[in-house]
């Protein structure tokens, strides 16, 4: 039997064991939680300053690093992402002018989405914003805020982060991007109140306000349904049943005609063209002649300047 001293040692050892066990459990929980709670974006950032002369390019090296960190460390939503679920995207800023700490240029934004049961990735977004202007001084911190507009630069970064997340969500579930689209509305409203360029409704058919409207206005909201039908019921199905998946894609394209009838110049139409036209050539390369002609007829009405690619689709070629 244990002596009094021995009993105290036993109790102490038990407490130490329990303490160590508790620490291990907490550590495992934290490690597991951090794995589940990965940030949403896996973003490559590139800044091109070839058009500039007599400028300290270190300014843009610093900005590029800050933007990369901003996109890849900010938690934009409360959703849980595994590391392999992060959205792959690219952000290209081409600087045309930098005077008095004001950057002017354009931004190309791209994002991709994996296709189920395959190694294939599909382009979800490929858009050029031609009206970009913001103030920036080297070393200026980029601060994420939800309910206020910190400055024009972070407003632009937030807009495209949420736009990428919104489109991605819609491709996986019907209106799966609802929360992100709500954030986009708030960002646009705050930016419009600031008077900064690139945000005003009706100012430009392809500015940030127009991008939001292309997916949230009643007359063009079919674009959101198309995102789900095209990707989740179409592309994701093709690698199991090519004919069935392709049929769903064909059905989804009717949304484009609805948008065209409502607004032939709507930015949703050019977004689809820039992201999907090459892909469609490959999708229909093994379709029947009747199916190819049906799709080509629709696309030629929407995109009369793209007849080279549309004729490739019609002929059953593969890119």
Residue ranges and their predicted role:
Residues 1-13:
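Single conserved hydrophobic/aromatic residue that forms the stacking wall/gate
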Residues 4, 21-30:
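Sec-dependent N-terminal signal peptides
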Residues 12-21:
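Positively charged n-region of N-terminal signal peptides that target proteins for export
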Residues 34-38:
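Sec/Tat signal peptide C-region and signal peptidase I cleavage site
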Residues 39-104, 115-117:
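Start-of-domain marker
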Residues 46, 233-319:
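A cross-kingdom marker for long, charged
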Residues 101-213:
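Acidic/His-rich structured neighborhood in mature extracellular/periplasmic domains
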Residues 176-269:
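Flexible, glycine-rich surface segments
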